[in-house]
UniProtKB/Swiss-Prot annotation:
This is Elongation factor 4. It is a peripheral membrane protein. Its EC number is 3.6.5.n1. Residues 4-181 form the tr-type G domain. The gene is lepA. GTP binds at D16, H17, G18, K19, S20, T21, N128, K129, I130, D131. Required for accurate and efficient protein synthesis under certain stress conditions. May act as a fidelity factor of the translation reaction, by catalyzing a one-codon backward translocation of tRNAs on improperly translocated ribosomes. Back-translocation proceeds from a post-translocation (POST) complex to a pre-translocation (PRE) complex, thus giving elongation factor G a second chance to translocate the tRNAs correctly. Binds to ribosomes in a GTP-dependent manner. It is found in: Cell membrane.
Length: 597
């Protein structure tokens, strides 16, 4: 294959700017997919992606255009899936920067552009939705130049929906995206694993970009991170269905199957090389993103524990940012502590477990990872509130802080600044992009933004504000652990870590919701919220009262009193012996509301 005719590129865009639609047009114009087979969001294979209208998983497809070979690596646009974008960019030489002409540059567009620049990619601006009456092409070009700092004179103006000017995008890819550098078939093999998924019959399938050398069916290769050896049984390209080949050469993007059954053997970002003639140095990986949000996953039916473990194994194969470890809860039994990149990521994994793997789970209240510095000078990283040490051993607690960049219309600045202040934000700067939009920068605790910040920001700005963030480290905060007691017993699944100023309000809310969710017992049940043994909120679940006097004659007052006293004594004994059964529905209801809040 003539290496000068290969073009590897990704499409980067903010959510809803038309990225999947442009990918559909490219597939249609190049006859990669027959028009009769083409459906909207063709590369978004998950039902979840189609329903929500978002891209979650990256996808790679080979396209023939004139005498050129394109490899399009599709990427997600939501802030939670930045790690998928960075993997796509590591396998590309160029990026199409798609900007909606009616919305302009948004915060996540900016974040992805910086990723592309870090990877030294050629960026081609594409201005989309020019067919809409509200499109402002000139203003969008100005924003590309002023905010991002790249020239917009070669920007291609298109309507991905109608197909207007989309063939010009193909010519721009040929003209501006560079061919692969140092793509020599005769050098020792170096191929980057940028994604993987599981196939029941062939085991782990790896998506790779070959940077140098050649990989053939029958070759023995090894992973450079752990030296594990495997034998290639099948390889090929996706266009977009899998097409078998005898070999993959330098510059190509394709898939490899080697009957790998253990998902943990394959690390996305690893380099594969041949056993016989190995490369000396691995390829630089890509920037891995660490989970920022942690929650407990417990099977609704305890017999599904092994099934949940197997399902998490399979999902983490294609989602390298997902982390999990085993944990136990007195209230919920055996489960896993799972780490996510944000609320949408958590939501998607929960839904995938339910739909694809048919595993019903209870998810505990999400938490970030805190740094607990003890009085003896040591520290612990705690993501599970129930594992927080006793207050007497704690010197101080630090929580993760982020720098948030918010791009928004000027008329909503007051609303969004109020929201940031309420979330304990520290104002940093405000820049006016033009006469209608601004860039606002705040430092905020991560724990305040992972739950509902995104939704509140969208509703306060009528959907026009966009937001992206970077972790900047840990800062000391006045944090406390709130425990919930039911009839005097601590329920570890309901423990939360919160700021001292909001502890009372959250405790009142949680005890009230528990009172409403837990069915009445035969005895009175106190629901208490405590900080270090001190009760700060209480609700009482009233007891059922059986009418023990209904058979008595109205005038038999002494017998009447005797029966009531006997009932009272019985209830007292029951209360001492009785443990409160919390039904599954109550757990689901409380923890779901915790997430919603």
């Amino acid at each position: 294959m003539d290496k000068s005719k290969i073009r590897n590129f990704s499409i980067i865009a903010h959510i809803d700017h038309g990225k999947s639609t442009l990918a559909d047009r490219i597939l249609e114009l190049t006859n990669t997919v027959a028009a009769r087979d083409l459906e909207e969001q063709f590369l978004d294979q998950m039902d979840l992606e189609r329903e929500r209208g978002i891209t979650i998983k990256l996808n790679a497809v080979q396209i023939k255009y004139k005498d050129y070979t394109f490899h399009l690596i599709d990427t997600p646009g939501h802030v939670d899936f930045t790690y998928e974008v960075s993997r796509s960019l590591a396998a590309s030489e160029g990026a199409l920067l798609l900007v909606d002409a009616t919305q302009g540059i948004e915060a996540q567009t900016l974040a992805n552009v910086y990723l592309a620049l870090e990877n030294n990619l050629e960026i081609i601006p594409i201005i989309n939705k020019i067919d809409l009456p509200s499109a402002n092409v000139e203003k969008t070009k100005e924003e590309i130049e002023n905010v991002i700092g790249i020239p917009a004179d070669n920007a291609v103006c298109v309507s991905a929906k109608t197909g207007l000017n989309c063939e010009k995008v193909l010519d721009a890819i040929v003209d501006y995206v560079p061919a692969p550098k140092d793509a020599d078939d005769n050098k020792p093999l170096k191929a980057l694993i940028f994604d993987s998924y599981f196939d029941e019959y062939r085991g782990v399938i790896m998506l790779i970009r070959v940077f140098q050398g050649k990989l053939k069916v029958g070759d023995d290769f090894k992973f450079m991170s752990n030296n594990a050896n495997y034998h290639v049984i099948e390889l090929g390209v996706r266009n977009p269905k899998e097409t078998k080949k005898e070999y993959l050469e330098a510059g190509e993007v394709g898939y490899v199957a080697a009957t790998i059954r253990d998902a943990k053997e394959v690390h996305v970002g690893d380099t594969i090389t041949l056993v016989e003639n190995p490369a000396l140095e691995p390829l630089p990986g890509y920037k891995r993103k660490k989970p920022v949000l942690f929650t407990g996953f417990y099977p609704i039916d305890t017999r599904d524990y092994a099934e949940l473990k197997k399902s998490l194994d399979k999902i983490s194969l294609s989602d390298s940012s997902l982390t999990w470890e085993q944990e136990t809860s007195k209230a919920l039994g055996f489960g896993f502590r799972v780490g996510f990149l944000g609320m949408l990521h958590m939501d998607v994994i929960q839904e995938r477990l339910s739909r694809e793997y048919k595993v019903g789970i209870i998810a505990t209240s999400p938490s970030v990872e805190y740094k607990v510095v003890k009085t003896n000078g040591t520290f612990e990283m705690i993501s599970n509130p129930s594992l927080m040490p006793d207050r007497t051993y704690i010197d101080h607690i630090e929580e993760p802080y982020i720098e948030a960049t918010i791009i928004l219309p000027n008329e909503y600045i007051g609303n969004i600044m109020d929201l940031c202040q309420n979330k304990r934000g520290i104002y940093k700067s405000l820049d006016y992009i033009d006469d209608s939009r601004s860039r606002l920068i705040y430092e905020m605790p991560l724990g305040e933004i992972v739950f509902d910040f995104f939704d509140k920001m969208k509703s306060l700005s009528k959907g026009y504000a966009s937001f992206e963030y970077d972790l900047i480290g840990y800062k000391t905060s006045d944090l406390v652990k709130v425990d919930i007691l039911l009839n005097g017993d601590k329920i570890d699944a309901f423990s939360i870590i919160t700021h001292k100023d909001s502890a009372y309000e959250k405790s009142r809310d949680l005890t009230k919701r528990l009172k409403d969710a837990i069915p009445r017992q035969n005895f009175e049940v106190p629901v208490q919220a405590t900080i270090g043994g001190k009760i700060i909120a209480r609700e009482t679940i009233k007891a059922f009262r059986k009418d023990v006097t209904h058979k008595l004659h109205a005038s038999d007052i002494s017998r009447y009193k005797k029966l009531l006293e006997k009932q009272k004594a019985g209830k007292k004994k029951m209360k001492m012996l009785g443990s409160v059964e919390v039904p599954q529905e109550a757990f689901l209801d409380i923890l779901k509301t915790n997430v919603d809040k």
